[in-house]
Each structure stands twice: as C-alpha cells, then as structure tokens.
Amino acid sequence: MPNPISLSHFAFAYGRPENTAVLKAEPADFQVDEHIAYTLSGEGEHLWVWVQKIGQNTDWVAKQIASWAGITAKEMGVAGKKDRQAITRQWMSLHLPGKQAPDIGSLDVPGVTLLKAMRHHRKLQTGGLSGNRFTLVLREINGNLDQIETRLQKIAGKGVPNYFGEQRFGNDFQNLAKATALFQGQIKSPKRHQKSLYISAARSWIFNEILSQRVRQGTWNRAISGDVFQLEGSQKWFADDSDPSLSKRVEEKGLHPTGALTGRGVLPSQSDAFQVEQAVLEKHPFWQAGLEKLGLKQERRALRVLPKEMHWEWLDQQTLSVGFDLPAGSYATMVMRELFEVKLED
C-alpha cells in the first residue's frame, strides 16, 4: 500500500496549480444532476422517482424511500451514489407490481424531495447512467485571475487526466488498507458491497499510477506504440497498432488512449504502453495477485476525460461558478484539481 497515502503526488497535466479555493462551503456549492441514456416508457411494474437530496447519504435515502413505499431495499434500483455534502438529483426505481403508486408529496424525510415520478418496465441498474451535470461554486479564491482563465480554457479545450477521485478510496484512504487485508484473508465473509469497494480501490489506485506516469511523459492525451483505445462516448475499447490514422483520431478527441483496470490474464497493451503499465504492476505484486485470484478480468479506462458543455462565470473576484458534464465514473473534483489547490469543506 502506498505510504504516505495522498493524491497530491499524481502528476498534473498543466502543472501543479498555485491558485487556491474552497469547495463545498455549503451543499448548494456542489450540485449534481444525473443523466440516463434512455427514455422512460410511462408504463410498467417499476415506478421511477426523480429524487433531490441535500446533505444526505444515497444509501440511507434509498432505504427511507423503500420503507415509505412498503418495499425492501432489494426492490429499489439506484444507478450510482452521489456526494453527501451537496444538492443532488438522481433517479431511483421502486418495484411496485400491481400496486398503486404512492403520492410522492407524502414522503417526509429530512433533506429529501421527490420531484417527479414515472413508470417504466425495467429496474434501474447499478451503473445505469450516462453521466452527470455538475454545477460548482468555488469560494475564497486566492490567485492570479488571468492564470485561472488560461487553465479554464485549457480544461475546456483539451480535457484533463481521468483520475479516480478521493471518494473512490474511502475516508482517509481506508479502502486501500481494507483491500490489503481482504487479499491477506484477514476479512472473513465480507459483505458483497464492501468487498467490491475494497477491490475497486486497489484497482483504481493502480490505474491512477499508470495515468500519472503517462502524464509525466506527456502522453496521457496522445497515442504511443502499443496503446489500447476507447471510443469517445463509449466503453468499448480495442487494440490496433497498425493503423496510422489512430493518432490523428486521438488528437481530434474521437479516441482516447486507455490504462489498465488490471485483473486476470495478459495486459492487452503492447510495446511502450505495455512497459508503462507493467512497471506499475510490478510495484504492486500483492494487489495484482489478489485481483487475479478473485478472477477479475482485464478492463480499460480512458486516460483522458473531456468536460462537455463547460461554462463558467465570475460571481465576484473571489467566487467562481463552473458547470460541465462528465461521463459516468469521472470525477468533478479531478477536473477542479487542474484549476486550484482545492480545500474541500466536507
């Protein structure tokens, strides 16, 4: 396990920012709106509710809604967890076959409002979102405003490294220690959800180290020999070292180079890309062996993420509002990392 544990040593695409800011001074400063990739049918056994929560934990909110509807937590569907210290809006589904939909205005849970409801024939699956819209307010900004504007333009035009954020690793990075304990057999019969968190933490840290090395090389946003690519807007990836047009497609942002979400089997990368990934895996043989033993298959994640529909406005000389869309699995805090040294008021 890395020691000391921090994200600060991971490389910055545009240099470590000298500007500072405070984020999440209040929940309204961090707003998230979930996007799903399909249209609700208006009929079916599942009632989908558009949930706004303020300062509440996603799992706790889902349990309260399940209790209100008279169903079990297993009959609830949630695509993904949202920040607690925030105002978030997301879909949740309730399995109500042959039952009348309850009055959404009757829910009485602190910090939770059901804004609308619609029937659909399927349950909302974990990961069943296409992305999120973030609206952030950064306060107490200290720095050069011209430099901040320059960085904003770079982020909007070129994207940022697609690091996993601190949320992935738990409070004080405890999920990394738990992953080590899990692989050592010290955690007996872990709950499925907890086990998944610990495994993901170790895998994500390895990916971040691979990405950081590519950032240091200046190749996080361009193709190198042996790369594996992912289509923009898709989870599909492929390896092809013979097509010279791929480098141009990466430059044009239609393709992204990827890094390993490691598991069992041989890395699909080759040549220079393989050397970068293999060097990182050799630093974490215990984690790698644990992931292989659990049977996780090799997967990939884009090294670059492009914030879409990015807009910003100065509310005053020390307060900046920024909005952008990110695909599912990418972190707004990692976008802000390239702009400010951010103090999170969690």
Curated annotation (Swiss-Prot):
Its EC number is 5.4.99.27. One of its GO terms (biological process) is tRNA pseudouridine synthesis. GO terms for molecular function: RNA binding; tRNA pseudouridine(13) synthase activity. GO terms for cellular component: cytosol. The lineage of its organism: Bacteria, Pseudomonadati, Pseudomonadota, Gammaproteobacteria, Thiotrichales. It holds the Pfam family TruD. Belongs to the pseudouridine synthase TruD family. Residues 159-305 form the TRUD domain. Transmembrane segments: none annotated. It is an enzyme of class 5 (isomerase). Gene3D superfamilies: TruD, catalytic domain, TruD, insertion domain. InterPro entries: PsdUridine_synth_cat_dom_sf, PsdUridine_synth_TruD, PsdUridine_synth_TruD_insert, TruD_catalytic, TruD_insert_sf, TruD_pseudoU_synthase. Responsible for synthesis of pseudouridine from uracil-13 in transfer RNAs. This is tRNA pseudouridine synthase D. PROSITE patterns: TRUD. The active site is at 83 (nucleophile). The keyword Zinc does not apply. The keyword tRNA processing applies. It catalyses: uridine(13) in tRNA = pseudouridine(13) in tRNA. Keywords: Isomerase, tRNA processing.
